[in-house]
Amino acid sequence: LSEPDHSFSGPTRRRAIVIGGGTSGMLAAAALREHADDITVVERDSLPQEPAPRKGLPQARHAHLLWSGGARAMEELLPGVTGRWLAAGARRIALPTGLVSMQSQGWLRRWPETQFVIACSRDLLDWVIRERATADPRIKVLSRTELLCLEGSSARVTGVRVRTHDGEERVLTADLVVDASGRGSRAPLWLGALGVPAPRHEEVDSGLAYASRVFRAPDGTEDFPLVNVQSDARQSVPGRTTTIVPIEDGRWLVTLSGTRGGQPGGAADEFETFARSVRHPVVGELINGLEALSDVVVTRSTVNRRNYFEKVKSWPEGFVVLGDAVATYNPVYGHGLSVAAQGAVALRDNLVSHGLTAPRLAAKVQRAVARPVSLAWELAVGQDIQYPGAVGKQPGGAARLLRRYVDRLLLTATGHPAVTKALFDVMTLSGPPTALVRPGIVLAVLRGPTLPQLTAPPLTDRELALAQSPQKTP
């Protein structure tokens, strides 16, 4: 990709810089493209020109779910991106129709579609976004370039200082700098060097580790559902989960996870055993006898971390933080991608309303970005803090009361379509959390499920046949 030109000094040329060439960075660049003449993406590594692993993204080997709330946001920013994913082999799975899920209170029924999820490898997801974003001539990528520091003052960020792959140091100026560099972001340090106070920081660590392996899917499973067995945080045992995500090229990506004291290991001969050891063995049964296409990959960097940038007084002009640089979540919940997309939409919307150089734009964007972050954060840490050995701020009385209501809501969702719809609206980041406390939903929750709980996974006869004899097409 060609190198951007920062030599132009005319007063009318609007420039933006995005730190990080991952998904958050490309979405931020897409959000900026109608509001800046030149958008430079500063990326430390070389980006693949095809669906391939990206250096610095070890979590890409594990299951990633793009919930409908995030997919819609990405489609807003990059029209046609959903069709491109599907053409490349991704699956659009209806929810809850295409989901076989045991949550803490039991099996969910496969009601007609109210939401959806995009299922594919992270490599494919990222590549399509990168391909569509960089097709815009206003977006240029400066790869193999290290960001050294921010330029400017505590009142305004005016650009960045970088070191290129040949060792040259350069200053790039911009009207707006967006940090989308992910969980390794050094934004608090960069801002501190300019005299900006450090943001409040919070962590919740359940000690979760996760292990993944790719299998060749059985013949005839092109429309197989997403399968998931979740843990029950109310039990005083480590939380263990298993998930099968059907991905492109006739493969199943299987991810196991366990909190402190119950983590999966990296031994291939223990993978299926772990999958059978959770609350229901369906995932272990489904992968029995399948051809493994990869080794087991284990990741342990799963701490929930949040920087409250929106609370910093006198936030500098010209600087915004998005995506995992703001907050990272236990990946079991699959919210990181969707939150990044909704944060980029918040950036785009504020640019439309106020313009690139409007006073206090950055502070307004940072507050808007915090809204989807807060929802995903509460969903993640409210669950994780309950596990044995979890480290972090314990919930107060109000939070414990809310937890009891949510437990009752999850029980009701096992046999009540309207409650299931409200649950998926919130879980997919498609609706506000207030959807769970509307009068009709509260009344339904108080009454409880209208149907008896399922006693087995809600697989169809054909799917059951595949589960019992995975090498044969029923």
Which functions belong to the PLM regions below?
Residues 135-274:
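Predominantly flavin-linked oxidoreductase catalytic cores and closely associated redox partners
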Residues 103-122, 159, 256-261:
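Helix-loop-beta segment of a Rossmann-like dinucleotide-binding subdomain
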Residues 31, 51-100:
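N-terminal FAD cofactor-binding segment of flavoenzymes
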